[in-house]
Amino acid sequence: MKKISITLLAILSVILVGCSGSDTYRGSWKATDSKGGKFEIFFDAKNFTVKNSSGKSEKYDYTQNSVEIENSVTTYGIQLGDGRGYQINFPNADNETLGLIKDENGNPIYTISRKDYIKYEDVYKL
């Protein structure tokens, strides 16, 4: 019985850790929307904050629900507490400091960079 309890506890721990966000996208990002609006996004393990250029912040709870790697391009799926889903996509296999946040239909919402505010076109520059 003791072995079963320890095994179940270990499995539960792995599941709970698996729901928190990846180290790849945790931390601060400079984000630009399709209209050129500038935002600061900060990802923590289980929530993220979006701050607009006037300083207004909104905080969202999320869980990471998928990781997909295709042709060395990594996409993380996250689901917000209210049920909405988003993808955090890093289209350049050798550069995880530039990316896109897309809605459930794959439409880009923000371009993200660790250093600068960038446009959509900048993500795909060679």
List the predicted regions and their residue ranges.
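Short beta-strand segments that buttress and anchor functional surface loops
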Residues: W29-T32, T49-V50, T75-G81, I101
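Structured, soluble extracytoplasmic/luminal domains of envelope-associated proteins
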Residues: I78-G106
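Tryptophan-anchored aromatic micro-motifs
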Residues: D23-K38
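C-terminal motif of bacterial Sec signal peptides marking the signal peptidase cleavage site
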Residues: I15-G18
